[in-house]
Amino acid sequence: MSETDNFKENLSGNTHVRDTVPDENMAYRQGLKNRRRIVVKVGSSSLLHSSTNRLDYHKIDVLVRELSDLKNRGKDVILVSSGATAVGREVIRRTKSSADLVEDSKITVKQACAAIGQARLMMTYQRFFTDYNQISAQILMDKNSIMENLSKYNLYNTFSELLKFDCIPIVNENDSVATYEYSVGDNDNLSAMVASLMHADLLILLSDVDGLYTDDPRINPDAEYIEYVPHLDENLMKMAKHSTGSESGTGGMSTKLQAAMIATKSGCDMVIVNSRHMKVIHEVVQGRNYGTIFRADPDPDFDLQDYLESTT
C-alpha cells in the first residue's frame, strides 16, 4: 500500500470520518464569524507579479482593504508579510548588471536585499493603509524574540499596546540581521508563533495553493483535496514531504503543516487558502467553505518556548 493510500485510509478512520466531515466542516466554519483576533500571513508569491517579480499593487490594495474592513468590524488584525527580500532583490537587479549578481545567493546579499526591500514594502503598506484611514506599524522579530523571556515580554507588550491603539501591526522576520541560529526561516511558522504569542483565534495563510492535498497536485493529478482537518496527526505531517516553496518565497506545505501544529496546539484555528483573489479573506471569516481549515486542538502541555528551543 502506498503512502498516499495509507493516508486515505487514515482519513476515513476514527479521527477523519468522510461521511461526517462535510456537515462537521461547515458547522465548525460558521464559528469563524465570531473570531476576534485574526493573524493573516501573506507570502511573497501572493504580493508579486509572477512575470516580473515586482509588487502587484492591485492585489495589495485589495488585501489592505480586506484587513481594514475587518478592523472596522471590531476585529484585532495582525499582518505577517513576506516579500522584503524579493522586492529588494528586484531593486538591485534593476540597478546592477547580471554579472554583478553571480553571488546573489550569498547571505550578505540576501540581507542587503531584505533591508532595501523591507523599507520599500513598508512604504507601500503605509500608503495603502492610510488611504483606508488605518494606522499601521512595523515589527521585525526573530526566534530569539520569543525564546528569551525579557524579549518575549517586551514583544507581547508592544503588540498589545499597538492593538489597543487600533493599529494594524505588520510583522516580518528581521532578515537583514538575523543569524542562522535564531532565524525562523519562513513566515508560515513566524505567523503561527505570533498567533500563539498573542492568543489569536484565527490564523489565515494566504498562499499560491488552494489548501492541503494528499500529494502535490502540481505533480500528481490524482491528489485529493482535504477541506477539513479536525486533528493534525503524524500521517498528515508526513504527507507534506518537505515540499518546496515558490521561486520568490521559502514556505512549502511542510512549513504550513508545522505552522498548523503550533497554531492548533495553541488553541487557534488555521486556514490555508489561495490568495488568487484577496477577497477570499472575507469569505473565510464569514464561514464559507474556502481553503483547508485546521481545527483548534489545544494542548495544555504545549509551550511555545520549549518547542522553539527543541528546534534550534
Residue ranges, per PLM feature:
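C-terminal catalytic "cap/lid" subdomain
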Residues: 2-312
